Every structure is written in structure tokens, then in C-alpha cells.
Amino acid sequence: MRTEYCGQLRLSHVGQQVTLCGWVNRRRDLGSLIFIDMRDREGIVQVFFDPDRADALKLASELRNEFCIQVTGTVRARDAKNVNADMATGEIEVLASSLTIINRADSLPLDANHVNTEEARLKYRYLDLRRPEMAQRLKTRAKITSLVRRFMDDHGFLDIETPMLTKATPEGARDYLVPSRVHKGKFYALPQSPQLFKQLLMMSGFDRYYQIVKCFRDEDLRADRQPEFTQIDVETSFMTALQVREVMEALVRHLWLEVKGVDLGDFPVMTFAEAERRYGSDKPDLRNPMELVDVADLLKSVEFAVFAGPANDPKGRVAALRVPGGAQLSRKQIDDYGNFVKIYGAKGLAYIKVNERAKGLDGINSPVAKFLTADIVDAILERTGAQDGDMIFFGADNKKVVADALGALRLKLGKDLSLTDEDKWAPLWVIDFPMFEDDGEGGLTAMHHPFTAPRDMTASELKTAPEEAVANAYDMVINGYEVGGGSVRIHNGEMQQTVFGILGINEQEQREKFGFLLDALKYGTPPHAGLAFGLDRLTMLLTGTDNIRDVIAFPKTTAAACLMTEAPSFANQAALTELGIQVVKKAENN
């Protein structure tokens, strides 16, 4: 039906007769001439109808936005004064000789000239996806997956599918369950990741595996989370953590070079402890120049319990955050930031305004100045590198609260005061995570997942001191987003059972949930390691949007619903009966 795409016409096509198919993006009726901007997935081209082709001109008068049409015409160069430098096709136009209206369009529920609500965009997603910026994002996503497949194929990885209907495993979120008609009362789980299957593939001898795969997690949603999402899933045998990181770093550098024309360079490596200490986060945004600086040793003797208490507590921390130019902040802004850190458990926000650095105590403004000596102020200013016009905020509490509160404040200030370099790319690896963390109920939970191996520990050493264990794990972070994470896996049955035991999974439960894995570990399991990237999040970064729904064709809302199809929906009673399921209605309060 067509010979060319609208958006691909150039000066090289001048004089050629072309047939185009697409939609009316805009129509301008000048009486004797009608101009339309005609759009397809590749872009927009100007088409005009003149009196010499009366039939086409008459039909063109009926055109309205989003009519689906076919146009045949001749490509012409525009006069110099009419060249549109803002359009890829701005040097040419098409003189139409014939027009076919394939399908007309009703009045549109979306307004192309205004910002539409996200609710409207998701309800009429098929119209929203016609917008050039949305089409471009999905084209970029397709390019990314194509680049990934070629790269992985070139590096000896095999694309192997794993099951969608599987068994529930503990991976940190609730499973989506699928009832079995054949096995009444039993349920499949949709996979949160192909974790165990890819490990089993390593045990089967497929030493380099990858898959671009759907995963499912029934968890509370955020702007960068979806109940169904796509992973670039990778696993290898006989490779060290460093070797895995090198290959995966090469993949990501390849993506940025091909999609953005940017060489990310070598990725710096930072331990979890250093990231938390310096940035208050295990996924630090290195585009932001501010860092947390420990000052507890300077404040142990002050007569101010807010500082002295945490400064003298082994589990406490007092840290400072220097904000370049922050002395300009108003009292209201400071109060607003004080309320902001309370979200993260902080009780408030002490501060020092640095007016004249050289004057020390006499050159600052601070509600806590009366508790500080000149020597202490000089030491704080020296350690933080404060300059005239800076602000120093303090966090004083237990280590987690200080890291969370000042880490979040650092990001907010970086954005509010334009301190974060938005034109920069800042990738890094974060390694050496704690293997376990407190579950809040007196037990331990795996920081990554229960199949991650510890670094340099035997099973007996791990059992004796699990709190000291460091996971052989690694996360890739870009501009403050965790885009991928992985680890060296446990390939020894004794170690795996030890980890299960530490997590409170007894032997009977181990056999019920992971018997197949424990059996497989008995038969010459190779050392193996892997990683998974979030394709949606990578695409979000590479297309410059901060909303993951912008890079998924048909996403869910933050309530895990599809406004277009109205999923989820109630099942009919016959289907429920066949599955042996009875819906229990919630009792209404009178």
C-alpha cells in the first residue's frame, strides 16, 4: 500500500512519485490550497493539495485530525524561505495527486495541543502511542533489545526460555498465583525472576545463558515499578564476579554508544559501606557533588544531647552535608527541608550558615552555635570544605536514619538548587553488600536473595557469624538508578542449606520448596554467577523520561490496573467453579 515512510523522505527523493500511508497530524485549509502534516511511525511530512488535482483537493477538505489516509504524490523541494529546520523532512514536501480516506476518526478524547492526564492517556493508549515522542521511545526500546541480542550472541550466550508457570519461591515480594484446573486446590506462581531455572541451566552445562523475559511481582507500585516488567537475564558458569561485571559493563557501554553516541568510560567501583557513608544510599547519584561527612568525633563532648548522644553511641552517627551556596535558603525553605527529613525518621535538621569562613564561630549563623566552641566550628568547616555562602546541614541519630535522611536530602537539594549535572552520565558498580539484614522481628532476611554466595566464608563460619557475612554481589547504578544487580551463586549444598537455616527455613520447608535445587547441587554443580538488568529502567534512562510507564506499550497504573482493558476483572462463576475457587466477599460495615 505504500512505497515510503513519511518521516524518511529527503531531498534525495525529489522528483519521485511516492505512496504514503498514515494519519492526519494537522490540516491547514487556505481555500485554494490545503496543507496537511501526515504522520507515521517514522515521522511527519508536509503534503499539499492544489486546484490542478480538483478531486484530491475536494476530498482533502473533508480531512480531520487522525483520519487514516493513503496519499500518492510527487516529492518536491521546498523554496528556501519555506524550509522548516525543525522537521527532519523540512526541506521537502509532497504534491498530492490522489487521496484515499481509509478510515475516518470520531472526535478525539485526547487533545494533541494540550497536556492530557495520565489517566486519559492510559485509557486511550492506542491514541497516545501515535504521538511521535511515544513512538520514538518504543522504537528505542526495540533498538535496545536488538542490540542486546546481537551483543549476547556475539559473546557466546544462548537465548533459552524458562517456564512462566512455576512454583512460588521467596524473592522478596508476593507472587501472582494461577489456579490449576487439573490439580484442584493447587496453584502455579508467575515467576518473579527465572533465578532457579537459570541456575539449573548452569548445572545442565549451558555455561552462558541469557533471556529477555517477563517477570511478575505483586508489590506496592512506585513511579519506576510495574507488576509485570522485563528483565535482561544473564547467567554464566566458570566466570568470576569481576569477569561477569566486565562483560555486562561492556554491554551497557555498547548500548549507550549506539543509542546515545556517548562513551560511558570505565565504571568506578564502590563498596556498599562507602556508598552509604559518603552518599547515604546504595545507589548513589554521582552527578550530585555533595557528600556526607562524619563529624561525630568532633561532637562527643558538646553539651547538646542531640549531637552528643549519637556521637557517643556505637550504633549512632553524626554527619554533615555541605550545600554549596545554601546560605541563601530562606527560613521557610529550611523548615520545609526539616519536615522533609522527618519522613525518613529524623527528628529535625540542625544547620550552620557560613557567612564568612575566615571568622570561624563569629562568621556563622546557627541555632546550635551556642553549644559549639570556636575550635569545633573551625574543625567542622575545615572537614566539610565549607566556603562563604555555604550551608551545612546535620543528621544525628542511628546510622540508618542518618543515611536515609541525609541521603534523601542530598538528592532533593541537588535537584532544587540545580547542583546535579543533568547533562552528565555517572555509572558505577556497588559491591560487597551485607549478606543479611535485620527483618525487624529479631531474625535475618537475605539482602539480595537466598541463593547468593558469601565472600570468603565457609558454611561453618557463616553459621557462626551471619551478621558479619559479605555477599559476593554487585549492582550497576547509573544516575542514581539501580539498573541491574547480580551475584555469585551458591554452588554447594551444605552452604545452601546453611543459608536457608539462617533465614529460618527449616529442613522440611527446604525440601518442600527447594528439594529439586538441593538435589541438583549433589551432581557436580559448576561455580556460577549472573545478573539481571531491568529493561524498562534502562530504556527509561536512554529515552530521557522519569516515568517507566512511558517506555512500556501497555502499562499498568500505580494501582496495578489497566484502564484500557479494565483488567483485572471478575471471573464468571462457571470458570471459578471449574477451578474449584469460591470468592469470599468482604463483609460490609453497617
UniProtKB/Swiss-Prot annotation:
| CDD domains found in the cross-reference section | AspRS_core, EcAspRS_like_N
Q: Which UniProt keywords apply?
A: Aminoacyl-tRNA synthetase, ATP-binding, Cytoplasm, Ligase, Nucleotide-binding, Protein biosynthesis
Please state the Enzyme Commission number of this protein.
6.1.1.12
Q: Which Gene3D superfamilies match?
A: Bira Bifunctional Protein, Domain 2, GAD-like domain, Nucleic acid-binding proteins
The reply on keyword Protein biosynthesis is: yes
Compartments, record wording: Cytoplasm
Repeat as a keyword of this entry, yes or no, is: no
Query: Which residues hold ATP?
Result: R217, D218, E219, Q226, E482, G534, L535, D536, R537
Positions annotated to bind L-aspartate: E171, R217, H448, R489
As for family, the record states: Belongs to the class-II aminoacyl-tRNA synthetase family. Type 1 subfamily.
What's its job? Answer: Catalyzes the attachment of L-aspartate to tRNA(Asp) in a two-step reaction: L-aspartate is first activated by ATP to form Asp-AMP and then transferred to the acceptor end of tRNA(Asp).
- Protein name per UniProt: Aspartate--tRNA ligase
Q: Which organism is it from?
A: Salmonella paratyphi C (strain RKS4594)
Taxonomic classification: Bacteria, Pseudomonadati, Pseudomonadota, Gammaproteobacteria, Enterobacterales
